[in-house]
Amino acid sequence: MSIRRFALAALASALIAGPALAADTLLNVSYDPTRELYVEFNDAFNKHWQAQGHEPIKIQQSHGGSGKQARAVIDGLRADVVTLALAGDIDELHRLGKLIPEDWQTRLPDASTPYTSTIVFLVRKGNPKGIKDWDDLVKPGVEVITPNPKTSGGARWNFLAAWAYAQQKYGSEAKAQEFVQKLYKNVPVLDTGARGSTITFVNNQIGDVLLAWENEAHLAIAESDRGAFEIVAPSRSILAEPPVAVVERVASRRGTL
């Protein structure tokens, strides 16, 4: 099953769990590079929903850095559903906002994780800097584009992938920390989210390599001039597991639970 089909099945179960919807509008607060996924998803879900005899619903989307999005929900953004980049961001909705139960991750199948992804490198045509693996990212003169891990879930996956590579290769946390510090010294700009970093790299032509979600890298290639970019798969990356949750406190108040 493709990532998109699996995401569709899992999030649909979140949206239709419990009593029938009492409102005609839902808000999905999501992380940065999922806009295109959920445009397709929303259309497919609505067709499925209407085929079961229900009235069509409107599904609104909000996108941004995962950590920033979690903060917005805690501060009052009325999300019915959150689909964020890391479980830790959704945990904050319980810890700081009491918007979801502590055991939210047990409420849906597969630990509320409908799909997985990974982190890859996106380089320019011909790979002029010869970037093949993580070690190439810390070389002098190589500009690395990655978002700010303080606001972006994808950036934290990037950080963890680099750390895991260095720790395995060099054998200690101290060496891993040193490696990651060297990598970030090669980052000229820290955008707040993954899509912002893609725009910096693709549209603004800044940097030699973009650390990207796999789907974001493929999208950049599909929407750019043929052959303008290439994907490089590093020798070691990370299994990213973006989870979903119903924001039960908000959905209950709005009658969408």
Language model segments and positions:
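N-terminal segment of the mature folded domain
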Residues: 23-151
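Hydrophobic residues within well-ordered alpha-helices
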Residues: 73-74, 200-205, 244
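Ligand-binding pocket segment of bilobal, Venus flytrap-like solute-binding proteins
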Residues: 169-235
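Sec/Tat signal peptide C-region and signal peptidase I cleavage site
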Residues: 18-22
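Bacterial N-terminal signal peptides that target proteins for export
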Residues: 1-10
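A bilobed periplasmic-binding-protein/Venus flytrap-type ligand-binding module shared by bacterial periplasmic
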Residues: 118-127, 241-256
